[in-house]
Amino acid sequence: MGRVRGSLLAFVAIALALPSAASAVGFSPPQFVDRELAGGEPLTIADPVHHTIVYTSHEGTTHLYRPGIFAPLPFGVNYRNQVNIWTSSDDGASWQRTGVAGASADPTKSNGFSDPDLTMDEGGRIYNTGINLVSDSIFSSIDGGKTYDKGNPDCHNGDRPWLAGGKKDEVFLATNTLEGALSHQIFQSTDGGNNCSQTGVPDAQTNSDGSGYTGNGKLYYSKDRLIEPISYIGTDGSYNGVGVGTWKRGDPQFTAHKITDTTEFGHWPAIALDKADNVYAVWDDNPVDKTKTDSCGGTHPLPNNIKMSVSRDFGSTWSAPITVAHTDTGRVFWPWIVAGDAGKVSVVWYQSNKIADLDCEDSNITIGEGHILNALAASPTIDTTQPVGKRAIHTSSVCQGGTTCVAENKDRRLGDFFTNGLDSRGCVLISSGDTTQTDPTTGQQFAYSLPIFIQQTSGQSLVGGIDCATGLPKPSRSSLGQCRDRTKPVTKLVPPGLHRTRKFLSLKGVASDAGCKGSATRLKRRGRVESVLVSVAKVKPRHGCRFLLVSGKLEPKFHNCAKPFLFMAKGTKRWHVKLRVRGLPSGDYRAVARAVDASQNKERPTHRRNVIRFAVR
């Protein structure tokens, strides 16, 4: 059964159980909004008047991975120094890029490739933002997100802007005005984004001992009031608590309200307001074992939690936190939340398939969703599901170091967050980046994520309680992406395969990858070998292996042969590697070549085609 109570003891036993048949919340297969433009940090908003859904994402400049700062095609061709924007007029069945002449919006109103956000004012005007180095833009649309008639490419200097629509033609922009300082302020435009106030309302505090707090996350407006998440910061610079900042029109500054003391793993908490102005906050904690060190050199991570707390008085007081998600075998992180009618919320999060330091250790990342229709109850009922099933949307590490990730050649393709929202029916929409696809021409992995869109297809909506199985759009075949490549690549050592001298050992071979064939619902995936990895080890029965190192010497001790030291060969279809050796001791040796394809399928050793045994006497 997938119905679980929202207490820690009841929920720890099961993290992502299937919901019961009576409340079977289900989702569509991931739909690719675009097969060329980047999709990190995506958001959606529905326009009930123009019957459109607007989808926006980071353009990808600071999300590039493999090979570092190099901008491969098609990214370089499509670069516009603007956030990406699409609209759908058929409830998400198809998507169209906005703009003309190579721009997503008028460049005199929109500037900046990163940090998008969406909001709508009380007059129905939709706003977006982007950051270009240190300047935040605001631009807006009155036709459902298709064109942008108002805006300012330099509303104010700052970093990581968030928006909240106010009265007609009014929008608020929250941003960090100074790097390396708690400088969070909120600015205002009253003319659709054409002009912005230059004096902000602060929501940050630095204490004499260096501790403090800062506004940190998505901003919301309701009835002449603003509310946003805040993170509390200790004297060592780490997050040690979560809360909210609130403001009512005319106040000189925001007022901080702490929810609880806690560690944080993600960049910020997330909040949502339901139609009765109840406020919900979610965050991920970050327990670690300080007695152990992981492969990144940091403290060893432990299983963690997604927590939620509720306020019935617009953030002044908060309920005791409950656990929304937990697994003993992985990490849950980057939660987001959307609310509908009073007490009805959806929480989404990423989940790894193993305990890992995600900054440098690979894992398979999937999506989890918690559907809560009685969130105001003392013990809410949480129906959990996996919107993409066991399918991974990312198989790699997840760097959280911001712009330094690209410089250090770490994987930041997912950006810093993903989101859920509601369509015009009140059914849940999930927007995420996806790194599983490959270039249809070369078969190479994309250096950035692609935008995906997942729609609730069954179960109760968060508004009106309708069945989300009604009125579903039918996406096109091409939007569902490529077939899943489960076939491992093949490597063959070319005879004689091995050449050994007193100082060097050389291997050569060929490798190939079949990819997978298309179907009625999936596009084909071109096969591509990404790399060939080679290991050389002295083997001894019942003792294990001593692997050859870069120094040309063997490891000092025998250990499990399943943990090799690997060299990357030059070339892929035809490859070779020349390894230095220094005084190899006598004994039996084994050289193994393994190919890895663009879908991260890894070849296993065989005794015939990719393994050579030799002896040193």
For each feature predicted by the language model, list its residue ranges.
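Short beta-strand segments of immunoglobulin-like
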Residues: 494-500
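Bacterial N-terminal signal peptides
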Residues: 9-20
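A generic structural micro-feature
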Residues: 77, 300, 368, 412, ...
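Surface-exposed coil/turn segments at beta-strand junctions on protein surfaces, enriched
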Residues: 221, 274, 340, 413, ...
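Long, low-complexity serine/threonine/glycine- and acidic-rich segments characteristic of extracellular
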Residues: 484-492, 504-506, 512-617
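Extracellular, repeat-based ectodomains that mediate carbohydrate processing or recognition
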Residues: 24-486
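Aromatic/hydrophobic beta-strand junction motif of beta-rich domains
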Residues: 57, 349, 432, 507-513, ...
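Bacterial N-terminal signal peptides that target proteins for export
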Residues: 1-9
